[in-house]
Amino acid sequence: MSMRFCILGSGSSGNSALLVTEGARVLVDAGFSARKLGQLLAGVGESLERVDAVFLSHEHSDHAEALRGLKKFPQVRVFANHATARVLQEKLEYRPNWQCFETGARFRFADLEVET
């Protein structure tokens, strides 16, 4: 399986990385505004329109800020543990396409096997 992993940004102002495989485009955290994240993705030849999912490590804004702007992208699945999803949902005006999991679980997404 071929894959590409791009660090889009890392630090107190935001964290996000892009994982591209043959079957999926996944953001690992989304800690920038959706606009800024779109710019960062464009810098590596990608776009929010092409993202299939966001995997969130936790609820801090430097890891989850873009959720506010993902309302425009209902196809994007947002993976988080139940506690993280609950905390973030209280701050949002819409309901993302949550895909909740138990911490410690394993699951498949497209051609990826994920261990949490």
Q: PLM ranges: what are they?
A:
Residues 1, 47, 72, 92-94, ...:
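Short, structurally constrained coil/turn elements
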Residues 1-44:
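Conserved beta-strand hairpin/beta-sheet module of binuclear metal-dependent hydrolase folds
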Residues 9, 18, 45, 68-70, ...:
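Short secondary-structure boundary/capping segments
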Residues 34-84:
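Active-site metal-binding motif and surrounding structural segment of the metallo-beta-lactamase
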